[in-house]
Amino acid sequence: MAEMKTADIRAMSEDQMDDAILSLKKERFNLRFQRATGQLENTSRLREARRDIARIKTIAAQKRAGKTK
């Protein structure tokens, strides 16, 4: 999965965001496992996945804060 753009994330529903976070967490787990066994070729993908998760969580929190105001 390529780096996610904020515009794409903002267009997602909360359920889609939850699904995206879950799939990114699974991907991160697999990437960490590959790194530990020496099979990981694209080491920057670990950082991208971590930041994508943070980006989605941030936008989800902003959406929730906007609904409560």
From Swiss-Prot:
Single GO MF annotation: structural constituent of ribosome
Keyword Nucleotide-binding included in the entry's annotation: no
One BP term from GO: translation
Keywords associated with the record: Ribonucleoprotein, Ribosomal protein
One GO location term (cellular component): cytosolic large ribosomal subunit
Top-level lineage group: Bacteria
InterPro entries associated with the record: Ribosomal_protein_uL29, Ribosomal_uL29, Ribosomal_uL29_CS, Ribosomal_uL29_sf
Family the entry assigns: Belongs to the universal ribosomal protein uL29 family.
HAMAP family xref list: Ribosomal_uL29
Protein name per UniProt: Large ribosomal subunit protein uL29
Origin species: Rhodopseudomonas palustris (strain ATCC BAA-98 / CGA009)
